[in-house]
């Protein structure tokens, strides 16, 4: 009888210890955004262009993404092609899509040298450009006030060596256009998180130092800047357009921590990790490790609030048209099949081990 009772007790104890393990497995998120939110972060997002082919929109409507960024529809050439004459149709479409599908909207971008109408580039008077810049920021942010959780206020203001990129705003207004832009934006929508956004910050070199100086400059004016966006247009291997593959977890983490040390958040804002095409099984494994490094670096720094992918499927990626002979940069292939990088990315977000080299 004693043996029977002991056996029963041991069996019950064994069952009791098995329950938490089972529950832990059940709690593992099965979608990217759910995994990110479960880690106490803000979102996994994607860029969006509304197309007649609904494949991407239908996938975005699901649970994989919690945030969307207008790929082109909120840029200056799309919203104010002629001075004082605003066009909202494309941006409204995306804002409505976000609202209807319960997505955050990370809005992009207000002051940028590219996709800028020629009439802006032709301005050579300080007062005129100040008026134009102020009105543009106020009108665009005002229309989407309360709908944009984050704004890329200034985009790509730096050269690779960390100096200021030549553009009409720098030539006519001077470096103060940076804090002035943030001051106007903060007044236009006080609730929105305001970011400086750029590419090639991830390597921790001179350009990253330039971004740190921009944060300090804006802060020195007593103006709000909430974060730095690292675009994350990276490569798996040396390509014709980029010689340095995606950095190590340690390098990426240090870069993000540098921003946190200045009291601002960070986010990966336009991630795609391209390779020399065509892709192979081995190249896809290398890509999976690179995506894992990006995700892990964000998990390592509490002030990294989110990761946005620059597209869903390779089918519509901007990469092949921009970088000849390169592509296969996203988590879904041309046929919307998940690539190995999807699983490694999800595993890291779920706190699981993933190969990172």
Task: Say what each PLM segment does.
Residues 61-67, 126-129, 139-149, 215-227, ...:
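Structural recognition of alpha->loop->beta junctions
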Residues 1-27:
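Fungal secretory targeting signals
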Residues 24-73:
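Boundary/entry segment of secreted carbohydrate-active catalytic domains
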Residues 48-64, 131-140, 206-218, 252, ...:
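Short, acidic/polar
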Residues 46-58, 76-89, 158-163, 201-210, ...:
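Acidic-and-aromatic substrate-binding clefts and catalytic sites of carbohydrate-active enzymes
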Residues 33, 63-81, 89-201, 264, ...:
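Substrate-binding cleft and catalytic face of glycoside hydrolase catalytic domains
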Residues 87-89, 93-104, 172-194, 204-279, ...:
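Glycoside hydrolase catalytic-domain groove-lining segments
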Residues 26-34, 80, 118-123, 139, ...:
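Aromatic-rich peripheral "rim/lid" segments of glycoside hydrolase catalytic domains that contact
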């Amino acid at each position: 009888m004693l043996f029977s009772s002991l056996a029963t007790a041991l069996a019950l104890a064994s069952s009791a210890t098995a329950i938490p393990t089972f529950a832990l497995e059940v709690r593992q998120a099965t979608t990217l955004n759910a995994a990110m939110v479960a880690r106490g972060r803000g979102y996994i997002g994607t860029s969006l262009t509304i197309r007649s082919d609904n494949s991407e929109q239908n996938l975005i409507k699901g649970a994989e993404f919690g945030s969307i960024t207008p790929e082109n529809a909120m840029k200056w050439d799309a919203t104010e092609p002629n001075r004082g004459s605003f066009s909202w149709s494309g941006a409204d479409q995306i804002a409505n899509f976000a609202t209807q599908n319960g997505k955050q909207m990370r809005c992009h971008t207000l002051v940028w040298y590219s996709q800028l109408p020629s009439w802006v580039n032709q301005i050579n008077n300080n007062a005129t450009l100040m008026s134009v810049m102020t009105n543009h920021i106020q009108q665009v942010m005002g229309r989407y006030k309360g709908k944009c959780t984050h704004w890329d206020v200034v985009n790509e203001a730096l050269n690779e060596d960390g100096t200021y990129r030549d553009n009409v705003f720098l030539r006519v207004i001077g470096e103060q256009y940076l804090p002035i832009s943030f001051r106007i934006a903060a007044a236009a929508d006080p609730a929105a998180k305001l970011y400086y956004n750029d590419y090639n910050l991830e390597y921790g070199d001179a350009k990253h130092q330039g971004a740190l100086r921009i944060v300090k400059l804006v802060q020195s004016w007593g103006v709000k800047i909430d974060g730095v966006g690292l675009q994350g247009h990276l490569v798996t291997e040396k390509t014709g357009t980029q010689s340095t593959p995606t950095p190590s977890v340690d390098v990426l983490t240090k870069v993000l921590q540098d921003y946190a040390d200045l009291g601002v958040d960070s986010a990966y804002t336009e991630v795609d990790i391209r390779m020399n095409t065509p892709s192979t099984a081995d190249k896809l494994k290398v890509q999976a490790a690179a995506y894992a490094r990006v995700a892990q670096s964000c998990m390592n720094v509490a002030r990294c609030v989110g990761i946005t992918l620059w597209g869903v499927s390779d089918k519509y990626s901007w990469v092949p048209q921009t970088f000849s002979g390169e592509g296969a940069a996203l988590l879904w292939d041309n046929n919307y099949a998940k690539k190995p990088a999807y699983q490694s990315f999800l595993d890291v977000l779920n706190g699981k081990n993933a190969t990172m080299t």
